[in-house]
Amino acid sequence: MRVIRSLLLLTIAIIGSVLSQSSIDDGYTVFYSQPDNYYVKPGTFSNGVAQAIFSNEMMTTGWSFMSISSSEGLYPNDIIAAGAGYLEGYISQEMIYQNWMNMYNNEYHNVIGSDVENWIQENLQYLQTMIDSAPSNDLYWQNVETVLTQITYMQRGYNQSVIDNGVDASQSLGITEFFLMNMDGDMIDLGPALNLTNGKQVTSPATATSPKQAFKEFMRRTGHCSALIKMTDDLSDLFSGHTTWSSYYEMVRMFKVYNLKYLFNGQPPASKVTMFSGYPGTLSSIDDFYLLDTKIVVIETTNGLMNNNLYHLITSESVLSWIRVIVANRLATGGESWCQTFSLYNSGTYNNQWIIVDYNKFIKGYGALDGTLYILEQVPDYVEYGDQTAILRTGYWPSFNIPFYENIYGLTGFNETYAQFGNWFSYQASPRSMIFKRDANNIHSLTQFQAMLRYNNWQNDPFSQGNAGNQISSRFDLVTADDPNNQYLDPDAFGGIDSKVVSADMVAALLVNAQSGPSHDNETPFTWNSQWNQKYTYAGQPTTWNFDWMTMSLQSMKPASPSSDSSSDSTTFN
């Protein structure tokens, strides 16, 4: 075990939350010189390896924005990946450090276990062996190699920024820290697996001795999220949306656009542009929410494992979820091919329900063709997926952290937790399932869809059972600890931390509407008050979260325009 500069870094992190910049720049360019040198200059220059637009508007919008594009036809894949990573690490060093310190202090309690470090090294050795032994024209491993190159050089650019900008050397980070930021979702399952391997006691929802302990473990293992795919009754539109559930200390947010002009075997990948809600220092969303230029939307919510029966199947000789989703996004031409690619080299970590919406197969006024909606669910050593467009044609597809496929439901231990604790663990009758059944088919516009994804009206909604955590965008900070009816939930700075939505027209135009922070449509905006600011580090965040919707495009973010039909909308559910 190693303890890393805890008290000093905690102090710096808190100071950083006050000093964090709120500026919009005119762009940056990264240049390459032989044999392996990269340097960053302000401004955008077409002869560089890659160009970036970056703004940190956390204090005014709840978001930062990063758009990185590579120059076309000038450099090979390894230099494009290295340059893009170096550039991002260099210009967003402050925010990466804030994100890491919030995670390090709150999640790892200032200690990284040697078992985690060793597993990462074993996994990297496996990946390098597979890359080296794969045929030179193997698309999968070529793409994995670019991902590893990008993160390696992100760390290098980050540390060079620390040096060049006179930042305290204690802020330098190793490759382990960068991998842990990207593995945040995978650690939900890898952490318990390593603990069991080391002979430690691991409580699961299935072995809990009380409903409250069971639900606490359930939330820890399935902390992400709510999602909804909604086809309007007149078949004129198809909405896709996602609300991330997470600890509030993780609200240092960065919406990202990658437009990296790779050529694999002389051809570009199916998808060249990826837009996603993410975090400083991460190459994947982790939420997850992606809009691709192939007109495919990729979303997930976490199912998790309710028992410990499958953790022994997790091995370092696999590809972690955060890498597999990047590769699948690039190579997929539709829902089925996405599922086929993602299923390869299953790590058994971050066991999610993946929702793949192919807008190429949605026809306005006609509806959804077969293949519009694919659903994939994963557990260690097993993946199941299929075309679920028929369900979408009934009006909507909901997702709320409970498995859809019967085999997955059984393998993950939900049968046992349902038998013991009832409808909290029921696909058909859990609180969010019932809310979607009641309200989803009352959505007719984008404004209403946004309101649904941000929905929290726990005081008046009977399905909340008097609890602010039982809503589409939960607010566990509002849970009343001494409520005699509350046998399940404890108050915590945890809940829905954002929402992202698209319509058919927005997908075609590569636009995303996004709102950051806990839901405040019907509730008081969340504030880091004395109840929470002494319990958690929240470097880089505003004190109060009261922000509106933003529209993200390829090169900017701006306040979202009111929907043209908003005047006639009724956005009150329940």
UniProtKB/Swiss-Prot annotation:
It is an enzyme of class 3 (hydrolase). One of its GO terms (cellular component) is extracellular region. It holds the Pfam family Phospholip_B. Its EC number is 3.1.1.-. InterPro entries: PLipase_B-like. Glycans are attached at residues 159, 195, 415. Keywords: Glycoprotein, Hydrolase, Lipid degradation, Lipid metabolism, Secreted, Signal. It is found in: Secreted. Belongs to the phospholipase B-like family. This is Phospholipase B-like protein A. It comes from Dictyostelium discoideum (Social amoeba).
